[in-house]
């Protein structure tokens, strides 16, 4: 499907520039409302949507615009205020609502924002519904008669409901007593959620990145900037550090030694724990960028590994296609579909903590069978429209390099989607091998 407005993760951009303007977002809400109202005319009753947001200052403006758009189309609106993206997915499903909407740009700076939709089941909106919304955007905006306008109200118990849901994904037989955790909320949507979840399960919690001011989301804190977390873990002598991004769908973990563990390693750990608990795990899904050491480690324990395109949307699609439950990305998007319908940083952290409790081991101990392969990435600038896939010199160089890796490394070459650059990535057991192979391929491209 060719999308005019919807990208792989909703509608996103810089605030004040198309399409993230108040007038467009109001029209987007109205168009989505018309699509939902049409579905309701087939006997489902008047539709109600849930709207949540992260802590960006533009969230107030865009929330008001969405509210106006939906209610003008005859759709009722429930407003949660700041709440993690996966919390909106959960509550949409739990409250039996028609759809959920999140105002967030995830890990991006505060001056970006976006609109993301969830279906009634808490899943991403189907492509055909996105297509209907885009078609409705091309129609004139007509307000419903006064008797048919929607109502809007705030729900005050949304944080508490979501906190209890998160806790329900942690084994009843376990608690977190005796653990000291540093929790970095990125000054984002988890600031008033994550610390409570871990505290109520018994942990001693030191919260950082939990003072949002509308402009500091993801600024020097959170999953994309773990430096402050590493410092705090060492300063407080904590057992672990947990970092979430602005909308709390990503997770990065730091151990007591200050070592950072990414999503690839955490995916392997969760798979191993499910197996240790007696659950069958047929396979797991990563992406084109997942470290090969994780793929090989999973194969050693009899778990099939499949690579999807980069993006949690594509990981989810592959999991659903194969009826598997576990997948993720190195960035920290982890999917545990036996616990939640979408990626959830807090729920993922609880799965990691459950594995530590069940095993009695440290993170390093649980992952001693996985030593990530070194990666070498070289960006080669090319002319716009350059056809690297037909480049004879690159093909010849690849024919030499790949046999040398002998199944203990890999080559990934792809064009950037945003600039005239071809990215050459080589992964190998030894850094020198990766460096040499990447340079060979890059030089062939430049020739």
From Swiss-Prot:
Binds 1 Mg(2+) ion per subunit. It is an enzyme of class 5 (isomerase). Its EC number is 5.4.2.10. Activated by phosphorylation. The active site is at residue 106. GO terms for molecular function: magnesium ion binding; phosphoglucosamine mutase activity; phosphomannomutase activity. NCBIfam families: glmM, PRK10887.1. This is Phosphoglucosamine mutase. It comes from Cupriavidus pinatubonensis (strain JMP 134 / LMG 1197) (Cupriavidus necator (strain JMP 134)). The gene is glmM.
């Amino acid at each position: 499907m060719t999308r005019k407005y919807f990208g792989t993760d909703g509608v996103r951009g810089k605030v004040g520039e198309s399409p993230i303007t108040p007038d467009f977002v109001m029209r987007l809400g109205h168009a989505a409302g018309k699509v939902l109202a049409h579905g309701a005319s087939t006997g489902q009753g008047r539709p109600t949507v849930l709207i949540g947001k992260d802590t960006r200052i533009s969230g107030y403006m865009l929330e008001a615009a969405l509210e106006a758009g939906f209610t003008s189309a005859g759709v009722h609106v429930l407003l949660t205020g700041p709440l993690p993206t996966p919390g909106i997915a959960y509550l949409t499903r739990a409250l039996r609502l028609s759809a959920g909407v999140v105002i967030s740009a995830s890990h991006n700076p505060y001056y970006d924002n976006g609109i993301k939709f969830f279906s009634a089941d808490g899943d991403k909106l189907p492509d055909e519904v996105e297509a209907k919304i885009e078609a409705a955007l091309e129609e004139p905006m007509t307000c419903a008669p006064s008797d048919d306008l929607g109502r809007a109200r705030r729900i005050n118990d949304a944080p508490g409901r979501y906190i209890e849901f998160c806790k329900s994904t942690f084994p009843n037989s376990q608690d977190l007593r005796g653990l000291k955790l540093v929790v970095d909320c990125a000054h984002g949507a988890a600031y008033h959620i994550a610390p409570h979840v871990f505290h109520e399960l018994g942990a001693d919690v030191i919260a950082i990145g939990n003072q949002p001011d509308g402009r500091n989301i993801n600024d020097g804190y959170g999953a994309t900037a773990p430096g402050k977390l590493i410092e705090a873990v060492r300063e407080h002598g904590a057992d672990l550090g947990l970092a979430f991004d602005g909308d709390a769908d990503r997770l990065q973990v730091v151990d007591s030694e200050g070592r950072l563990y990414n999503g690839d390693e955490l995916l392997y750990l969760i798979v191993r724990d499910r197996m240790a608990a007696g659950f069958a795990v047929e396979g797991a899904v990563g992406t084109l960028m997942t470290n090969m050491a994780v793929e090989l480690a999973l194969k050693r324990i009899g778990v099939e590994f499949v690579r999807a395109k980069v993006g949690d949307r594509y990981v989810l699609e592959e999991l659903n296609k194969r009826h598997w439950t576990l997948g993720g990305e190195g960035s920290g998007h982890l999917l545990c579909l036996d616990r939640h319908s979408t990626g959830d940083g807090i729920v993922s952290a609880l799965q990691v903590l459950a594995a530590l409790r069940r095993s009695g081991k440290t993170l390093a101990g649980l992952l001693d069978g996985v030593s990530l392969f070194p990666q070498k990435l070289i960006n080669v600038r090319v002319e716009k429209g350059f056809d690297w896939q037909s480049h004879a010199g690159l093909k010849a160089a690849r024919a030499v390099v790949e046999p040398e890796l002998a199944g203990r490394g890999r080559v990934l070459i792809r064009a950037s989607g945003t600039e005239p650059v071809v990215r050459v990535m080589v992964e190998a057991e030894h850094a020198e091998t990766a460096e040499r192979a990447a340079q060979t391929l890059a030089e062939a491209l430049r020739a």
